[in-house]
UniProtKB/Swiss-Prot annotation:
It is found in: Membrane raft. This is Altered inheritance of mitochondria protein 3. It is a peripheral membrane protein. Its main location: membrane. GO terms for cellular component: actin cortical patch; membrane raft. Transmembrane segments: none annotated. Residues 103-114, 253-269, 296-373, 426-440, 502-534, 696-716 have a biased composition (Polar residues). The gene is AIM3. Residues 140-152, 162-249, 283-295, 383-404, 654-663, 783-793 have a biased composition (Low complexity).
Amino acid sequence: MSDFWDKNKGSIASGFKSAGKYTYQGAKYVGKSGYNASKNHYNKSKEQRDKRDKKKGKKKNGDDEYSGDDSYSDDDSSYSTASIPVSSMKDPNSFPPPPLKPQQVQATSSSHSVEQYPASAGVPQQQLRQLPPQPISATQQPAWPQQPAANQYDGQVSAPDQSQMQYGGQTQYQQPPAMQQPPAMQQHPAMQQPPDMQQPPDMQQPPAMQQPPAMQQPPAMQQPPAMQQPPAMQQPPAMQQPPAMQQPPNMVGQPSNQFQLPEPQQRQTPPLPPVTSQPYGEAQNQAQNQGQFQATPLSQLQNMQQEETTRSVPNAYDPQQTYSQPPSIPQRHTPQPVVNQVQYQESQSSIPQVNQDYYGQQPEVNQQNNLMNRSIPPPMQQQPPMQQQPPMQQQPPMQQQPPMQQQPPMPPRGPSLAAPAYGGTPNINANAQLPASSGITVKPYNPDEVQTREPLALKVDIGNLPPPPTHRDRGTETRPPSEPKPSPAIRNPISAVPAVSRASTLDSSSVPVNSIPAHQNQPIYMQDNSSSVESFPDEETSDFNNLPPPPPPNRRVTEQNLEKSAKSSTIGQEQRNDSKTEPPRAAIVGSFNSNPTINFEPPPKPFRPVVNSDRKSESPVQPQPLARSANGPPALPSRRGTQTSFESHPTPPSMESSTPSLPNRLNRNEPPIAEKPVSSFPPPPKPFRRVEAESPSHSQVNDSNKESSAPRTHNFGNDEDEDISAPVKWNPPAELLERKSEIDVKKGKKAPPPVVKPKPKNLSSVNKVNPEYEGHKPVGSMNQNQNQNQNQNSLNSITDELTHVHLRKTGISLEDEGKKFGGNDTSIDDIPPKFEKIETSRKPKAPPAVPKKKDSIRGAPPPVPAKKKNLNATPQPPPSRRNNNVNNDNDDDDSNPFEKYMRDAVPAEENRLRK
């Protein structure tokens, strides 16, 4: 081992060098790679942030800035975590809804859904999808004169136009039941315009009114000359349908197209309020009332357009905008009556005039772009409308304008109907009337604007209202002394009784009027607010306030006591009014005042039933109040919360005592027994016990009691002659003692035990047994000092000791043993133990002694732990449970833990395997 380092230190050093070299190179490579990667990532993300900042700088207008997150992505075009401002987003109303499968229901947020019907066979579902229209700026305007080339694309008719003639928020072209086309004639979803430019059901135009005369309608379906459009509204020759696109002769009376269109439910839009889902009758009635509205002036529409284009934040969703078609109605081949055609043509002819003047012209390129984006299938051709109107989807700012609110009414047969504001036309009821003024502008709702609320002025003077009603037991009413109380005549039920009967009622029931609460169910009498509470006369109020308080509850009341209590209560009331320490308060019936003012003597004690009430009522002298004893019980609580004096209580009649040993009970100047404190009474007699020292003869007891045989009289009324607080000693008379002794003899009570002879001095040592005898310690053993003290005790203590010691009779008397060994001079050791304890004889013998282990085998005993405090209170087992034969050296040690347990249960060593 000593040569290991000398032999291998070169290889060990080279290994350390190579390991350190490659470790350094690897760490350097990893560090450089990470640094370059992070640097490249930072540069790329910085370029992306710069590009975004440039784009946002171009898009920002005025205050439309947003504080986006500058976090960057890992690559160039994977994703961007920065949020896009809402102002730069496209209007969601311009997007078409996603296509739905047949029998699929579109989930709506307006608590109703539109059921979808299967599409017509022959048109694939993929061909029904439509791209969203290309948004253009607000400065671009649709072109009214449109070339035929704009209506055709690859030999097929474009979709101008029947749907674009409609305005408002209606997405689907839903025909009324009587005017709907069969599935072969229905409009393709690609020809439908976005939801912000279509017409609600009440403004829809049936296809029968949109067909030119070249479509071979019957004469009844043709438009009469009086209902045709004005020259400015009619379609130019270039907009007419070519002959090849007209309806074949076999379709006379039922206009149709050369292709089959799916049902309008194939293209579902956002929800529409239920009010727009109207049957055909309502739509027809609304169409008849369309003539009541006239067109808005051109200058006003231009001003509204400028206001709407300057607004950067779009309005919130208008629930009145019709974004979806009404619930679909089964398509029927039903010809249209002539009356309906005339009515719809009348409402139709007034629409395009404002649109032409307001929107101006639009280049043909925009129309072609829209037609190309709609992706109409090649075999499809469109039903040409009779009138072509400009597409209204190119004006998104007009969507914010409140619809149908700027058109004043006009005569029913007016030539033009007002074109409502672009986007979100509400459903017009048949009886709807628009405001007459045409200069109304709607201010958009700004949630951040601070709204000032007008203060509401109370029309009722609160100061003149009476106080509200309160519960009668809620509390006492406190009023200043100067303010008069309201008369109880309007508050108390007693007020309905006349004054004479009311006074008699008070005397009989002893219930004062002022004890009834001041506020008691005020809504019953609160009828006139003009009359105040203070307008009642003061004479009646003073009469009620001067009534005496109620007396204490007496179960047996006489008329004399009532008169006396009323007189004394009136005196106490006058004394309280003179003091004026606090304002008077009305008492509450059935309540107890927890904080009374205690400035009067305690009430009298309860009394027994009246035996002779006339004798005490004639006493002219009032008894003096007794001084309360320190040992007596506390006074009873007051039964009333009002202030009373001791004189206000009537003196209860006393019961004449039938005891002949108390002659002073007949004295009328002395208060009755019920009014005296309990502590003044003598204690009850103690149970009789004979004195054992005087038990041989009762003559001494009888002689000593002759002097006290005379009855003792007590003057309870005189406080100077007797100390009431001192306990009164009472000795029973001799007759009572003799009578009780005779009763005890008759009952068979044992005679007293005979006089016990004096105990010998060494009697207690007889029971002392040698500790080695029977292998146990006697319980009654005592030391020598205890024996000496025991000899000095009295005879009673010796008797008590003998009663607790159970001795077994051995046939040897104690006197014989004393005479045998010479009386009291016998020593303790000379007397053999003739007596043993009974309990000892019944116990089994102790187990044999275990031999002591050798010190060499026996290990050192473990250290004895300190004695715990909680073990001191543990009672020790009886001496018989201890094993005293094994090593009794440590028995007297207080800290020895084996005193509390059996030594056999505790091993003496930790390891038992060494035995």
